Amino acid sequence: MDGLVGSEMCIRDRINTYRGNKNWMKVHEQEMNSPLFDDIENLKPVIQQGASDSAALDNVFELLNISGQPAPLAKLMLVPDAWSKKNKTLPKDHQQLFNFLNSTMEPWDGPAAIAGTDNEWVIAANDRNGLRPLRYAITKDKLLFAGSETGMIELNEKRILSKGRLGPGEIIGVRIEKGKVFTNKQIKDYLAKEYKHFNSQIIDLDDKLTIEDEKNSFSGDDLRRRQYTFGISLEDLELILHPMAEDAKEATGSMGDDTPLAVLSDKYRPLYHFFRQNFSQVTNPPIDSLRENKVMSLKTRFGNLGNILDFDNLTKQNIYVLNSPILSNSQFEKFIDFFGNNSAIIDCTFAENNSLYDAIKTIQKDAEIAVRQGVTQLILSDKDLSISKLPIPMLLAVGAINSYLIEKKLRGYVSINVQSGEALDTHSFATLIGVGATTVNPYLAFDSLYQRFEKKLFGKFSFEECVERYIKSINAGLLKIMSKMGISVLSSYRGGC
């Protein structure tokens, strides 16, 4: 296993979500405060400059330990189990514990087997995927051996009391003071009981933001002008958009692409085309998003990022969750109504006689003012474009505001929600989320679907069914893109660009 001298944690293999975790740790630093430390600024940056993925995880693990969180709890915060409310075999108190811990930090996804200590506990554990072997043996003379390979240390079989391997998300540990080995279930039972006050106000928004009474915003010539403005062609509508709503999955085509690179093309190409998707290589395996979807999640969290060093206050604030970051037109309207005065619309268009640079500076300042006034939901919208107002490329707008708010130490107080006419295929959604978007409403894609629905091109499907199938295809595409990078959870992918 990899670890530096003096480390409290070491890992075998790597952390796929390192870039996103590192970026979000900068956001958590903005809220960090504890009476245990005279000057919290002495702990920043938590992740040392130039640190590797294993060193970065060790830095955060150590921070949680010295702030009073025991090693098993810190492990579950950083490298949580894969779990779902649909899992009827999972005890309710375990569900409540996992639900709370998953709402506090972004998971550090492996593949990784880890070992760590806080001088009270010594633990060994696997990440949610369990792709790295971690075997253990307990001897009659009260010794626990754990490692990635059998035969690391010669043991007389007569000494062994029990042995086995840890599965996905499982943990084993020794509480040094008591001289006792705790199994996976015993550790989680202990934590669920010890921290049963973790009754955070987690509110599921899926029941409140239902897909119903879907309507279009634009039609006729107005719709066509907007499609032209955002570079949406008839080919895009027929070969990309239509199959997604009809088949509830991404369109497939023949292999081969002789399209020039966006940077070399003499035709208009949206900013999304200048980005390429990463993929896992060599010892860093991808995930099968179809057969391993139980360990993957698009669950999206809203609400302020709390102080990770103060669990008492973390349990007092409302945390809102959705099962998908993609919102239909009616869902987005309900979303804005739900948050009311806690939301603010940032107009991402600019007059034709202004420069793009000045427009970006303007929306950055608008976002800062809104957050300082107590807004928790920013709505970035290009819907107000007209013959005299041009849209700021939404990818540029989201990235600019996300990085600006981090610089101003305000990002942890707000979610960035996008209402975009550009977003059409899964790649555009993935890049928007990758630069920091919390949710995306592709209003023009839905209006374009309605145009085709009116022409009766979707047969027996209602328009609401077309919308649901389109969102389902986008969700599947996002899971596929994440899985190629070996990332299981959307919150770890978000902001990782």
Show the residue positions of the predicted features:
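Extended, highly charged accessory segments
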Residues: 1, 77-78, 92-93, 102, ...
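Single conserved hydrophobic/aromatic residue that forms the stacking wall/gate
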Residues: 1-6, 11
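Flexible loop/turn segments at secondary-structure boundaries
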Residues: 16-17, 23-26, 121-124, 131-134, ...
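Short histidine
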Residues: 17-18, 23-118
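Gly-rich Lys/Arg/Thr-decorated short loops/hinges at beta-loop-alpha junctions or inter-strand turns
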Residues: 39-41, 85, 338-354, 380-385, ...
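N-terminal leader/propeptide and maturation segments of large enzyme subunits in energy/redox metabolism
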Residues: 48-89, 247, 258-259, 456, ...
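Phosphate/diphosphate-binding loops
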Residues: 97-106, 111-120, 124-126, 143, ...
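Conserved structured catalytic cores and adjacent interaction surfaces
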Residues: 353-357, 362, 368-428
